[in-house]
């Protein structure tokens, strides 16, 4: 993968990244996948759609080397973005956009026509991030999330004609 900017590097996630990925997942309050689910996903055909971001010149705090990650699946010409997360101290530095841009580039190489994701209805910051990349809200899923219970906004992005 190419660097997204001079200081952000996006690469494929490896097994060695999983403990930190789970840590970022917990910090971000995402629905819990856990180590085993990420590992199982990595063994399948979608491993090229599991990316991590590192920031050059970032202070390494204990074992923290990753700034964020994204996990998606491709099926029947569609991309489903499952998780996007960036550590608090790296937010608003373009990492989310870099991760989304890299996954979209990969999806286009795979001849994916459309990308979908769900986001918590109350997560306005994430919705704005997705809109910056071109996603549009298309539907709502009632009570999609638990702990706490919340509706999801379904967003899509057409890739095939871009």
Kindly give the residue locations of the regions a language model identified:
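Non-catalytic, surface-exposed connector residues within folded enzymatic/regulatory domains
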Residues: 32, 93-94, 149
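Short aromatic/hydrophobic contact patches that present stacked aromatics
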Residues: 83-85, 116-118, 154-156
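Acetyl-CoA-dependent GNAT
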Residues: 2-3, 9-89, 100-106, 110, ...
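Accessory recognition modules or surfaces
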Residues: 97, 150-158
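Positions that flank functional sites
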Residues: 40, 122, 145
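Conserved glycine-rich acetyl-CoA-binding loop
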Residues: 87-101, 108-110, 114, 120-128, ...
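Conserved catalytic-core motifs of GNAT/GCN5-like acyltransferases
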Residues: 118, 131, 136-153
């Amino acid at each position: 993968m190419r660097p997204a900017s001079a200081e952000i590097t996006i690469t494929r996630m490896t097994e060695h990244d999983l403990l930190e990925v789970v840590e970022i997942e917990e910090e971000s309050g995402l629905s819990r996948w856990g180590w085993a689910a990420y590992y199982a996903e990595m063994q399948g055909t979608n491993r090229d759609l599991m990316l991590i971001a590192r920031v050059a010149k970032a202070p390494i705090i204990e074992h923290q080397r990753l700034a964020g990650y994204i996990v998606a699946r491709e099926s029947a010409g569609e991309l489903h973005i499952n998780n996007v997360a960036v550590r608090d101290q790296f937010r608003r530095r373009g990492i989310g956009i870099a991760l989304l841009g890299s996954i979209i580039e990969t999806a286009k190489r795979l001849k994916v026509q459309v990308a979908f994701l769900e986001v918590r209805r109350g997560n306005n910051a994430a919705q704005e991030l997705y809109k910056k990349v071109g996603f549009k809200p298309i539907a709502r899923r009632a009570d999609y999330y638990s702990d706490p219970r919340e509706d999801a906004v379904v967003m899509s992005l057409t890739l095939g004609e871009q």
